[in-house]
């Protein structure tokens, strides 16, 4: 899905949704160690675990919202794949021009200082896809930028 003005630079994270399943969190924690970042979202708790150059994100439903609706419809498991892009605005413009179905026509703020946008699941055979653009000075999951600040 690369274009002339943008490209996918790697897998940013894989997200797993659950409804407060300690077994899921314990399994991820035993494999990857403690989460580097924990954030409250609207109706969910997000934990980011480092997995080499990528992350595993767990989304725990804590109330009504997108994660709970996903769980009601599909149950626990893979929520989405997130690909890192070098330029999210040209990516969205290019994908829209190609007729790729988008959930977000404009990028919005994401975790860890990123800008994000979601493609409709129909764009990739029923799998929800997120595009992620890292900030100019990427931060690690603990909130420290690469310069050590």
Q: Where would I find each of the regions flagged by the language model?
A:
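Amphipathic alpha-helical segments
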Residues: 19-35, 91, 95-98
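A general secondary-structure boundary signal
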Residues: 13, 21-25, 35-37, 46, ...
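Structural preference for beta-strand elements that scaffold enzyme active sites
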Residues: 13, 55-58
């Amino acid at each position: 899905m690369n274009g002339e003005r943008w490209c996918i630079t790697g897998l940013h994270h894989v997200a797993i949704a659950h409804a407060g399943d300690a077994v899921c969190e314990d399994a991820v924690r035993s494999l990857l160690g403690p989460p580097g970042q924990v954030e409250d979202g609207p109706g969910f708790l997000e934990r980011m675990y480092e997995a080499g150059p990528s992350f595993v994100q767990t989304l725990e439903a804590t109330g009504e919202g997108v994660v709970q609706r996903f769980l009601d419809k599909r149950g626990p498991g893979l929520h989405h794949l997130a690909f890192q892009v070098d330029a999210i605005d040209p990516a969205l413009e290019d994908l829209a021009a190609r007729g790729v179905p988008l959930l977000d026509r404009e990028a919005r703020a994401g975790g860890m200082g990123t800008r994000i946008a979601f493609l409709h699941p129909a764009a990739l055979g029923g799998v929800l896809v997120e595009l992620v653009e890292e900030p100019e000075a990427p931060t690690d999951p603990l909130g420290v930028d690469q310069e050590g600040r």
